[in-house]
Regions:
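Histidine- and/or cysteine-centered catalytic micro-motif in compact active-site loops
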Residues: 175, 183-185, 215
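Feature captures the catalytic cores and cofactor-binding loops of soluble hydro-lyases/lyases
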Residues: 187-264
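Alpha-helix initiation and capping sites
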Residues: 164, 185-188
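Intrinsically disordered, low-complexity regions enriched in acidic/Ser/Thr/Pro/Gln residues
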Residues: 2-175, 180-181
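Short alpha-helix boundary/capping segments
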Residues: 54, 182-186, 238
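Short beta-strand-to-turn element immediately C-terminal to the catalytic PLP-Schiff-base lysine
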Residues: 173, 265-267
């Protein structure tokens, strides 16, 4: 896989001035830093496939991670090249010959929305999503050392969140060590960036674990299972349906993980 990233990352935060009113009714003009929204169209084999709204950081990982979590690819060997233009508004992905027959003539029938939390992400053409069925994971045991490392990394805060309080973070561990962290306006995007980083570095997904600052509903759990990552942790709580899905597919799920405390929702009998 070749990656040609022409985009020089732009500022993700901008100053905005407004009128601050305190509880006593006093008003004063005040400036603060706000997060920007970046839009990018993703073309796969020359077909407009996704429209992403994101924080303009780590764009190659976002594109590749989204392709993994949507079931389009599962290894870097399936991707011939990824190109991102100098403005970061257009990405082009060329897949290998095994994917070339997936484009059909009725693109309008393939329009669908994707889970986005607080962004306007859309999947325009879903014909490249070849991995329809989720695969059962090989369960893993929880490493308290890693869970505490996630907790400590989270409490050190991330630059954009510290400046704006507007981002979600995701941390990726490989073989028990944290190797990557990222931020995005959407929790789904942050997770996809971590998945994409693992793909770009040819990590065995089964030896990875992720920590997210976002909630864990079914759509987030589906992404983790589809990537083949056997452990997910969050400072938030999951939904009841997400716990059932994680249990069914052998995903170890940790929630309410902060201050060296946590709740293990699945596979805790092991």
């Amino acid at each position: 896989m070749k990656i040609n990233n022409q985009y020089q990352e732009a500022e993700a935060i901008y100053p905005v001035t407004g009128l601050y009113i305190d509880p006593e009714g006093s008003a004063v003009e005040k400036s603060e830093m706000l997060l920007s929204e970046h839009r990018m169209d993703v073309y796969i084999n020359d077909v407009l496939t996704m429209k992403l709204v994101c924080t303009p950081k780590d764009l190659p990982g976002l594109v590749l991670g989204r392709m993994v979590s949507e079931g389009m690819i599962h290894s870097s060997e399936e991707v011939e090249y990824l190109y991102i233009c100098e403005h970061g508004t257009r990405a082009r992905v060329q897949l290998g010959s095994e994917h070339c027959g997936l484009v059909n003539d009725n693109l309008s029938a393939e329009v669908m929305d994707t889970p986005t939390c607080c962004t306007d992400n859309k999947t325009i053409y879903s014909g490249f999503a070849v991995e329809k069925e989720l695969q059962h994971l090989e369960p893993v045991k929880v490493s308290l050392e890693l869970m505490y490392a996630f907790d400590e990394a989270f409490h050190q805060d991330m630059p954009l969140h510290e400046a704006t309080w507007s981002t979600h973070s995701c941390f990726l561990a490989y073989k028990g060590k944290i190797v990557y962290s990222c931020e995005d306006i959407g929790r789904h995007n942050a997770l996809d960036k971590a998945i994409g980083y693992a793909l770009m570095h040819d990590y065995d997904f089964h030896e990875c674990a992720v920590f997210t600052t976002g909630r864990l509903p079914i759509d987030m759990i589906t992404k983790v299972i589809r990537a083949g990552i056997p452990l997910v942790s969050s400072k938030k709580t999951p939904t009841a349906e997400a716990v059932k899905l994680a249990q069914e597919y052998g995903l170890t799920m940790i929630g309410r993980a902060k201050n060296h405390k946590m709740m293990q929702y699945t596979l805790y009998q092991r």
